[in-house]
């Protein structure tokens, strides 16, 4: 497992694609759930970080 860490729009997905890694984005997962009616407290908004505690609770 390789973690690519960076802020929104920093190129994490681009780097994964460049080197042939599978890109699993927490933000993408939240957006998919949001489209299915599981938007949590107005998150995720573009450029905002999701609080770690909320994320851990949400995906347990």
From Swiss-Prot:
Q: What does this protein need as cofactor?
A: Mg(2+)
Any GO MF annotation of the entry:
nucleoside diphosphate kinase activity
A single GO cellular-component term from the record reads: cytoplasm
Entry keyword Cytoplasm: yes
**Assigned EC number:** 2.7.4.3, 2.7.4.4, 2.7.4.6
What sort of enzyme, by top EC class, is this? transferase
Q: Where is the PTM Phosphoserine found along the chain?
A: 25
**InterPro entries xref list:** Adenylat/UMP-CMP_kin (IPR000850), P-loop_NTPase (IPR027417)
One Pfam family, short name = AAA_17
Report the Gene3D superfamilies cross-referenced here. P-loop containing nucleotide triphosphate hydrolases (3.40.50.300)
Q: Which positions in this protein are listed as binding AMP?
A: 26, 31
Q: Which family does it belong to?
A: Belongs to the adenylate kinase family. AK1 subfamily.
UniProt comment concerning the protein's domains: Consists of three domains, a large central CORE domain and two small peripheral domains, NMPbind and LID, which undergo movements during catalysis. The LID domain closes over the site of phosphoryl transfer upon ATP binding. Assembling and dissambling the active center during each catalytic cycle provides an effective means to prevent ATP hydrolysis.
Physiological role:
Catalyzes the reversible transfer of the terminal phosphate group between ATP and AMP. Also displays broad nucleoside diphosphate kinase activity. Plays an important role in cellular energy homeostasis and in adenine nucleotide metabolism. Also catalyzes at a very low rate the synthesis of thiamine triphosphate (ThTP) from thiamine diphosphate (ThDP) and ADP.
Subunit architecture: Monomer.
Instruction: Please identify the protein, giving its name as recorded.
Output: Adenylate kinase isoenzyme 1
Q: Which source organism?
A: Mesocricetus auratus
Species lineage: Eukaryota, Metazoa, Chordata, Craniata, Vertebrata
